[in-house]
Regions:
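Interfacial "cap-and-anchor" motif at the non-cytosolic start of specific transmembrane alpha-helices
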Residues: 160-239
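Alpha-helical transmembrane segments of multi-pass integral membrane proteins
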Residues: 19-46, 130-185
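Membrane-proximal helix-loop-helix units in multi-pass membrane proteins
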Residues: 102-144
């Protein structure tokens, strides 16, 4: 029952994220990412079905993988367009569809894909056929190729672009570890299978991606802004990553941040000195109590009557 609850929760999280990206942000460059999140959500929901009693385990085990068969193509398309700022070539789309996606869908309900499946000790077990292994290998290759593309793009980018790439690469690696470990490695080693953890792990991966994609990209946050919002845990993480991956941009952003602070303090001090009846010490105290002089315009003290 715990597995079902976790899978359904993962499904809801992915679906919400996917629908938000597609229907709220409506940015074409993130369309593949949004569709990928929705497929993760459907995958997680379908993964829960075989755990219910009196279900056709072999049928649902084959069915639950269907949303993920096209996922490698979407991943490659998204990473390529994200890094190089241009659409994935039509020829590349056709090759992946003809060589990978269509053959697997064609044999997805045959013994060449999954031969048998059963629930034992609250875990889903199945016997994989040659096309299932082909499916997993293709997924792993798409992840590896995406990481290579990110590395190439990382070298050419600066500032928060590098921070974004770190989040996306971390999410992809987490995806690789989750799927590779819980759907492939444990099975080949003959160890107890916990393959229901794979979609849960992928949910964490998309959450990591969303920090770099939604939290930064969709709101176009600059290096300076993450310094100004350093009380946020995500902003703290962004600052640490930026400091490591691009020290030059970090120093420039820090310089601009300090310059802005000094300018605001001087402006606030001057305004209070002219428009209020406070002494110098009272102005210092007031600025100190208001976050180092960052006073919203409407909170200025009026001159005493």
């Amino acid at each position: 029952m715990e597995a079902i609850s976790a899978l359904l929760f993962a499904s809801v999280c992915n679906l919400c994220l996917g629908f938000y990206v597609i229907f709220v942000t409506r940015l074409k460059r993130f369309l593949d990412f949004g569709v990928l999140c929705i497929l993760f959500g459907i995958w997680s929901a379908l993964f829960a079905i075989p755990f219910f009693e009196e279900t056709k385990t072999i049928f649902w085990t084959r069915t639950l993988t269907l949303p993920m068969i096209i996922a490698p193509l979407l991943l490659v398309r998204f990473i390529y367009s994200y890094v190089f700022d241009k659409e994935f070539p039509i020829v590349g789309n056709l090759i992946i569809l003809i060589v990978y996606v269509i053959p697997i869908y064609t044999f997805s309900y045959s013994d060449l894909y999954i031969t048998s499946a059963w629930i034992q000790n609250a875990k889903l077990h199945f016997t994989a056929g040659i096309f299932y292994d082909y499916f997993v290998i293709g997924g792993v290759l798409s992840i590896i190729s995406s990481i290579i593309v990110l590395v190439l793009g990382f070298k050419k980018r600066r500032g928060l672009n590098r921070v974004r790439f770190v989040y996306i690469a971390t999410g992809i690696l987490f995806w690789l570890v989750s799927i590779g470990t819980f759907t492939l490695i444990l099975r080949y080693l003959g160890l107890p299978e916990y393959n229901f953890i794979a979609p849960i792990g992928c949910t964490l991966a998309t959450a990591i991606w969303s920090i770099g994609i939604i939290k930064i990209n969709l709101f176009e946050i600059s290096e300076l802004e993450i310094l100004e919002k350093e009380n946020s845990l995500i902003a703290h993480a962004n600052i640490l990553i930026l400091k490591k991956v691009d020290p030059t941009s970090y120093k420039k952003a820090l310089y601009r941040y300090k310059k802005n602070i000094i300018q605001m303090i001087i402006q606030d001090y001057t305004y209070l000195q002219v428009h209020s009846d406070l002494t110098v010490d009272e102005i210092y105290n007031y600025l100190t109590e208001n976050e180092g002089g960052l006073i919203p315009p409407k909170s200025y003290l009026l001159k005493r009557s």
